[in-house]
Structure formats: C-alpha cells, structure tokens
C-alpha cells in the first residue's frame, strides 16, 4: 500500500503524515475510549480519551495530526469527522494547510487555513 507525505513540514521539519489511503472505507477507525500511544501523547493529565465526546475527539485529532505517523492517522482520523471538526481544531499552520489542500484535491472542498 503506497503512502504519500505532504510537502508541508511539521514540527522539527517532519513531513505532515497524510496517508494516501486515509479515506479508505475498509480501514478500521478507533472508536469509544482510546489510550493514545506515548509517541503521540507523552504527558499527563490524561492519555485516555472518549471519542464519543466532541472535546475529547478534538484533542485526539489535534495530537494525532501534529504528532502521529501515517499508521496513527489511518487508525484515529476519520476524514468525515475531520471535515466536521476542522474549523474548531487548533493546529499548526503547516498542518492545517496540508489537510486543507488534501480536502481540496480529494473532496473538492475548500477549508479555511
């Protein structure tokens, strides 16, 4: 399975992880209560979130989009939910631009950067 990375750079010059197959309906997505891996969320107060709660889902999406690998994005990010939450997410400008570009190219949707 091929993956692509955005030309936008994330923290410490890491490319923003946007897997080619992120919107594949066959990919299982995390749901319910999740505990984020240490490489995404490395400090307290909590590593556990309830994805049914909008505020928790926002925090998970922010952290995964900033710190996650392609596999993390595949596992935690539902692109329909991402679209619905996009305006409320606090993301670095390069991450926001990379995902806005993805939505423009793959869904024909213009999102504010």
Roles of regions detected by a PLM:
Residues 1-113:
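Long, compositionally biased intrinsically disordered regulatory segments in eukaryotic proteins
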């Amino acid at each position: 399975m091929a993956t692509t990375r955005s030309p936008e750079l994330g923290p410490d010059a890491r490319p923003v992880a946007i897997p080619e197959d992120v919107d594949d309906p066959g990919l299982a997505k995390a749901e319910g209560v999740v505990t984020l891996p240490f490489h995404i969320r490395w400090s307290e107060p909590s590593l556990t979130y309830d994805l049914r709660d909008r505020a928790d889902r926002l925090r998970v999406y922010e952290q995964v989009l900033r710190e996650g690998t392609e596999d993390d994005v595949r596992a935690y990010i539902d692109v329909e939910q991402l679209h619905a939450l996009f305006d409320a997410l606090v993301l670095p400008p390069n991450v926001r631009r990379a995902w806005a570009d993805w939505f423009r190219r793959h869904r024909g949707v213009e999102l504010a950067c």
